[in-house]
């Protein structure tokens, strides 16, 4: 039976490249000279600046570099800024994988449209199976058209 997996993966290498490009752009910006910096750790980035408006500009720089590297900014989880001595810091975490709530929402969408496919939650991915390849392509088109708050990829398509 044909099947495919719905996953939400983050390309860590492209994320690292985007952060490195943001650091280079930060060095070139005259208005952000001083105590502005990006610190990348695994799947999170810490923004440090002297004022809140600088953090907003740094966040825009990071978003633009993510878009250039084709990393979807929907996976960004921006936390509130907090003061740390004379500087202000802000955490940006990058989410990966499909959580239970989103998986249930995906399965519910597929069942609601009464497509001739079955969806099953398997950890951090959703496996969709059906008798015909066309039904699976219809399910992919349905999920691409919905705004679910996380970037979705469709992998492991088998006939």
Curated annotation (Swiss-Prot):
Record-linked CDD domains: YajQ_like
A GO MF label: nucleotide binding
GO cellular component annotations of the record: cytosol
Keyword match Nucleotide-binding: yes
Keywords: Nucleotide-binding
Disulfide bonds, paired cysteine numbers: none
Pfam families the UniProt entry points to: DUF520
InterPro entries: DUF520, UPF0234-like_C, UPF0234_N, YajQ-like_sf
UniProt signal peptide: none
Family according to the record: Belongs to the YajQ family.
Function field: Nucleotide-binding protein.
The name this protein goes by in its record: Nucleotide-binding protein PSPA7_4966
